[in-house]
A protein has these predicted regions:
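Surface-exposed amphipathic alpha-helical tracts and adjacent flexible/coil segments at the periphery
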Residues: 1-23, 28-31, 35, 54, ...
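Glycine-rich, positively charged N-terminal anion/phosphate-binding segment
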Residues: 39-58
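Gly/Gly-Pro- and Ser/Thr-rich, intrinsically disordered tail segments characteristic of DNA damage-repair
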Residues: 78, 113-124
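Short beta-strand elements of ligand-binding domains
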Residues: 66-67, 97, 117-119
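Conserved phosphotransfer cores of two-component systems
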Residues: 110
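Alpha-helix capping/helix-boundary segments
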Residues: 101-102
Length: 407
């Protein structure tokens, strides 16, 4: 088995997140149009935006994969051919269908696009993976429930031309590869059509039928009981083993998460993957960057066996808040920034950016674009000037630590 450097595939829920993923080192991004995708609550890309997004990515040498992974009903299936032709004409590199009918339509109506079988298909063995290849798939996104040993077994038994993609980072679903009806039953929002309300994150208690109104927690905790709560996956410390398993693509979950998340997690995995592949010991500072985004407690998922559940707390950990984003910066460090959250002259903050090792900075007095002094910019999205200690790339972040809650 040839050892291949995996593609780093990163989330792009909208144009801002796309720019961040591209700038911070993605080899490819995955996104959705306004139809047939599994993230209804992200902005996604309109027919006018999609060609612009593809051009932005392709100009940077980044591929674009588009999800077509809902389970379509009859009326939607009838609308699929025109949509697939639109994606093909726009220059999408690969489509990610979950439904067999959609997969076959993609081969007919989007002949220039590769077909990557979605994780919603729960591909969990070599026979299934090979069958999809025989039908025309160039890649399968394996079920998240597989161990490293099982993935290696698939790699050894399928055609070497078939690419294998696995998730390496992000939220995990308590159901099998996302096949869940809790949201449908409890809220009327279809989890298999991009509308999951995440009822697995709700607080639950037990009630005995002869004692109505008396609620008994499954686990004693003043915050509630989280009987279906899953940790987030983080495999950044195990990328060498993922490479050894013959995985062709490492996927970061999170199209519905923030642009900051897309940037920081992409950058962290880019640096560590490059170091691992080159035989270098990864710099710890990049591994620690995944702790600087909002997340639940981390685990290695199913890669090393059954992960169990995290039953203490369902809340996200948020240790860092974004103050501003750098729009441009000259060689002397004179920068134009866009405000995200309040901060003031004299604050100690961190600066992190594309290919930029994080560093601390004490904020000097600032000014607006007309040169009027600012001690504390206050208006969200306002543009202002500040003197940084050195030149930093556009799309760098100014951030500061915040007090933890929920740990």
């Amino acid at each position: 088995m040839d050892r291949r450097k995996p593609e780093l595939l990163c989330p792009a829920g909208d144009m801002e997140k796309l720019r961040m993923a591209v700038a911070y080192g993605a080899d490819a991004v995955y996104l959705a149009g306004t139809s047939f995708g599994m993230r209804s609550f992200t902005a996604n890309f309109t027919p006018d935006e999609l060609p612009q997004a593809i051009k932005l990515a392709h100009d940077a040498g980044v591929k674009v994969h588009c999800t077509v992974n809902i389970m379509p009903r009859n009326d939607e299936a009838a609308a699929l051919p025109a949509y697939l032709e639109q994606l093909d004409a726009a220059g999408v590199d690969a489509l990610i269908p979950a439904d067999l009918g959609a997969f076959m339509m993609a081969g007919k109506y989007a002949p220039h696009c590769q077909r990557h079988v979605s994780t919603q298909q729960s591909v969990a063995n070599y026979a299934c993976a090979q069958s999809w290849f025989d039908l025309g798939a160039s890649r399968v996104v394996l079920a998240r429930e597989l161990s490293l040993r099982e993935i290696l077994g698939i790699r050894e038994r399928v055609s070497p031309e078939l690419e294998l993609e696995t998730f390496c980072h992000g939220a995990m679903c308590v159901s099998y590869s996302g096949r869940c009806l809790l949201s449908n039953y409890m809220t009327g929002r279809d989890s298999n059509r991009g509308q999951c309300a995440q009822p697995c994150r709700y607080q639950y208690a037990l009630m005995e039928e002869k004692r109505p109104g008396e609620y008994f927690p499954v686990f004693e905790d003043e915050k509630g009981t989280y009987i279906m709560n899953s940790r987030d996956m983080c495999m950044i410390d195990h990328l060498d083993e993922l490479c050894d398993a013959g995985i062709d693509c490492l996927k970061i979950e999170g199209r519905a998460k923030s642009a900051y998340y897309a940037a920081i997690v992409t950058g962290a995995y880019r640096h560590v993957l490059d170091d691992v592949w080159a035989g270098r010991t990864p710099d710890r500072i990049w591994r620690d960057e995944v702790e600087h985004v909002s997340h639940r407690h981390y685990s290695t998922g199913f890669y090393y066996g059954q992960p169990g559940q995290f039953t203490e707390n369902s809340r996200y950990l948020r240790e860092w808040q974004i103050c501003a984003v750098v729009e441009k910066c000259d060689a002397e460090g004179n920068a134009v920034l866009s405000l995200r959250n309040k901060f003031a002259a004299g604050d100690t903050v961190e600066v992190v950016g594309p290919d930029l090792r994080p560093f601390s900075w004490q904020v000097p007095p600032m000014e607006d674009l007309d040169g009027v002094p600012l001690l504390e910019p206050r208006t969200p999205q306002m543009r202002f000037r500040a003197k940084l200690p050195k030149r930093v790339p556009p799309l760098s972040f100014i951030r500061h630590a915040v007090e933890l809650s929920g740990r």
